[in-house]
Amino acid sequence: LKRAVNKILVLSIWEDIWSLGEGGGVADELQFIRHLTKNGIELHFLIPRPQARKETLQDSLLTYHTYPNIFRHFRRLPGIAQRLYWAAAFPPAVVGRLEKLAAEIRPDIILGFTHHSLYPLNRIGRKLDIPTAVKLFGVMYLDRFDFPRAKYLLRSAEQIVALKFPVDRYIILNDGTRGEMALTRLGVPPEKISFLPNGMDTEWADVPVNRAEVRKAMGLPPDDILIVTFSRLIRSKRIELFLRAVALMDRPLRERVTIVIGGDGPERQRLENEARRLGFGDKVIFTGVIPHRDVVQFLKASDIFGATNELTNMSLPPCEALLCGVPVVAFDVSGTAEIVRDGETGLLVPDRDVAGFARRLEVLVRDDELRLRLGARAAAFAREHFVSWDDRIEMELDVLERLVSEKKRRRGIS
C-alpha cells in the first residue's frame, strides 16, 4: 500500500529524547522515532543545539539538524519573564533555519512539538505549501477557565497568542489537561483537532513480579505498606502536599507505612528538609531517578500511589500505577477523574484538601481488602482503556496520512 507520508520534518524544543533524565523515562518522542523509522519513514529533527554531545538513536532514516538554543538563556528569570522571553526569541532563532531545511529536503509534512512551533509552522507551511501539524503533549493551564482572568492570562498568555497562528491539524495528547475542550473554546475548529490517548507500556500488566525480591533489591522495607509517588521533582508536582498529608495521618497507621518518592529535580533538597521538619524523615525514602526498565517492578512492589500534581493527575505515572494494579489517591484536578474513578480505581480528593488526602490514605492503609480490590479494578480498567505505544503512534501516523492525502488530492497529485 502506497503511503502519503514518507518524509517528516519535525520541529522540536527538546535537545534530547529523555523525559526524566538520562534513562529515567521514555519520551513520546522516542516511541515516535522507533515506530516510524521501523516503518521506513524518513525523519529530520530540527532541535536546539545541545550544550554537550547527547545520546541519540542510530538509524539511517533519522537525521538531526540544530538551531540556536535559546532555552538555555535567562534560566534564572522568574517563570513568566522566562516564558515570555522564550516565546519572543524562538521564532527568530528557528524560522530561517526551518525554511531553508524544508526547501532543501521537501518533507511531506512539517510536524511541530508544543505551542512554540505554531508561528514557524504557520509561516513556512504557507510559504512553501507544505502541510503542517502541531503535537501538543498537554496544554498546561489552558483549560482552567475557572481561574480569575488575570491569573489565567499570567499562566497561559504565550499559548493564547501562539494559537492565533493556525496550522492544518492539531494533535492533542490526552494527559488530563482537557486540551480538546480548551482549544475549541479558544477558537480552533473542532474538525481540525485530533484528540489522542497517551501511549502506555501495556505489556507491563502481564509482567510477573516477586514483591519480596524487588523490595530487597531496592532497599525497601519488606513488610511496610509502601505509599509511593514518582515524577520530576518540580513545584507543580506539589510533593510537599503529599508529605503534609502523610504527616496528618493517624500516628499508629503512619507507623505501618514507608513513603517512597521516586525521581529527581530542583525540589529534592527542599522536600527532604520538609520530611524532616514534619518529623518523619526516617520513614521517607528518596530513590532518585528510577530507570524506566525498573518502574514496573517498583510499582508492582508498592501498595498505594499518591498523586498531587497541580495540572493533572492523569499523567503517565498515575496511569502506570493503575496498569500495575496500584490504587491511586489523587487530587481531583482537570481530567483526573477520567482514570481515577472514586471507589473503583482509587480515591479522589478535592484539590488542595490535604486533610482529606490524609483521610483517604488512612482508609487504604487500614483496609487491606479494599486496597486489594481497588488495585484489581485499577488493573482491569487499565487493560480495557489504555493503548500500547505502537497503537498510539499508529493513530498519529493515520492522522498525518489523511492530512497529507487530502492536501495532495486538492493539488491534483496522485
Language-model features: locations:
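Membrane-proximal helix-turn-helix segments that form the acceptor-binding/catalytic region
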Residues: 140, 151-171
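Short alpha-helical donor nucleotide-sugar binding micro-motif in glycosyltransferases
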Residues: 289-290, 297-302
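Carbohydrate-associated surface elements
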Residues: 176, 199
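Short hydrophobic beta-strand element within catalytic cores of glycosyltransferases
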Residues: 327-330
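N-terminal subdomain of nucleotide-sugar transferases
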Residues: 1-53, 58
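Aromatic "clamp/platform" in nucleotide-sugar-dependent glycosyltransferases that forms part
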Residues: 310
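Short His-centered aromatic/hydrophobic patch
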Residues: 112-117, 136
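Conserved acidic donor-binding segment of nucleotide-sugar-dependent glycosyltransferases
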Residues: 342-343, 347-354, 363-368
